[in-house]
């Protein structure tokens, strides 16, 4: 699994935190290599006004402050989710983890990476700036890992405050498509992606 590989390059027992909507994927990452990754604990509550009320488990805070590796599986697919994700990302980085990685499996604003008319806003650049504000971790800049970014030039929207890694899960897709195509008597896989 591509996300597990991005984490497994760090030391053992990386704490993986995640947005609640990413819980199934986070569990799959841990299941792929439970000796290298364990779930970090965080309470995702909300105040009456809807703003997040987040609390990182005390034992995990202690582990991070003592140099544990840390990663966050972000879910930035809706504007409503961005604030809570970023609040926790900033807090985790500030705890001083030896290494801190923000895993972005879907860069939702990525398809709006260029402008072709005066006044149009490249929201991909805005999201990159928000992620670029991630504080440094114990060893220096935090790392933002973006999967299957829409356009390679988007890596240059990030500032030098963070280290950016572009990864792809396309090889895994190719493997799965080949597996499906090899099934006897089964329909051939068809890939459709609407893009204007």
Q: What is the meaning of each model-derived region?
A:
Residues 1-196:
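PRPP-associated nucleotide enzymes
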């Amino acid at each position: 699994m591509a996300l597990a590989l991005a984490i497994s390059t760090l030391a053992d027992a990386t704490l993986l935190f995640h947005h609640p909507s990413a819980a199934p994927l986070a569990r799959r990452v841990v299941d792929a290599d439970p000796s290298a990754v364990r779930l970090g604990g965080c309470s995702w509550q909300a105040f009456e006004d809807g703003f997040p009320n987040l609390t990182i488990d005390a034992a995990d805070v202690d582990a991070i402050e003592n140099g544990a590796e840390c990663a966050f599986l972000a879910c930035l697919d809706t504007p409503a989710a961005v604030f809570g994700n970023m609040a926790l990302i900033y807090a985790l980085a500030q705890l001083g983890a030896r290494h801190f990685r923000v895993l972005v499996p879907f860069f939702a604003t990525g398809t709006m990476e260029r402008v072709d008319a005066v006044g149009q806003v490249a929201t991909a650049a805005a999201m990159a700036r928000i992620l670029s504000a991630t504080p440094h971790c114990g060893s220096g800049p935090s790392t933002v890992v973006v999967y299957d970014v829409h356009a390679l030039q988007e890596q240059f929207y990030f500032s030098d405050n963070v280290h950016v890694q572009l990864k792809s899960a396309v090889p895994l897709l190719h493997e799965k498509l080949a597996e499906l195509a090899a099934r006897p008597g089964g329909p051939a896989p068809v890939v459709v992606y609407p893009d204007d």
